[in-house]
Amino acid sequence: ESGAGNLELGAPNLTGLSESYISRQLSGFKAGWRDNRDLQTRTMTSAIATLDDASLSAAVAAIARLPHQKAKETAQTQSGDLARGKDLYTAYCSACHGTNGTGNDALGAPSLVGLDSDYMNRQYRHFVEGRRGFHPDDRYGKQMARLSLAVKDPNLIHDISSYVVQLPF
């Protein structure tokens, strides 16, 4: 309803994401661009499976109009090393996602601001494990999958997400 996500379901905050990114991701879910071994991906894939193009477009437009909100966080977020997370983010993420985390549509890089750390950690792991970015039509996903291999340690990934969640929006 609010688009700010649901931690219990593992659903991400959709507010603040660009219309083009939302459209690409929903189309990708429908086209099978993501490995659906996890409950969240299966849920999303089945939720949009029967939507026609007009319904998908209407959903994208409605999501894009939602006011930007910060996602709720868990206590685990505070456990990351923010200084190390900032250094890693600057070195490996900022060229595409921007120094302030707001993304770059021209590069296909979404805004990370407002996403919760659990979601970011899970999605990053999916790229590292080849569960995202494997489909030949997912140009930007393949790019992220290649780049994700630079940082594979779960503790370092957590440090990056801990840094990102504290960025202002």
Which residues make up each language-model segment?
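Activation segment of ePK-like protein kinases, specifically the conserved APE
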Residues: 3, 34, 68, 101, ...
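Short, electropositive, low-hydrophobicity segments enriched in small/polar residues
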Residues: 7-9, 20, 89, 102-107, ...
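Axial heme c-ligation environment in periplasmic c-type cytochrome domains
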Residues: 7-13, 29-59, 63, 73-75, ...
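Sequence context surrounding c-type heme c attachment/ligation sites in exported
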Residues: 15, 19, 23, 86-90, ...
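Small disulfide-bonded, cysteine-rich extracellular recognition modules and tandem repeats
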Residues: 17, 47, 96-99, 115, ...
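Active-site substrate-binding loop specific to GH73 endo-beta-N-acetylglucosaminidase modules
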Residues: 26
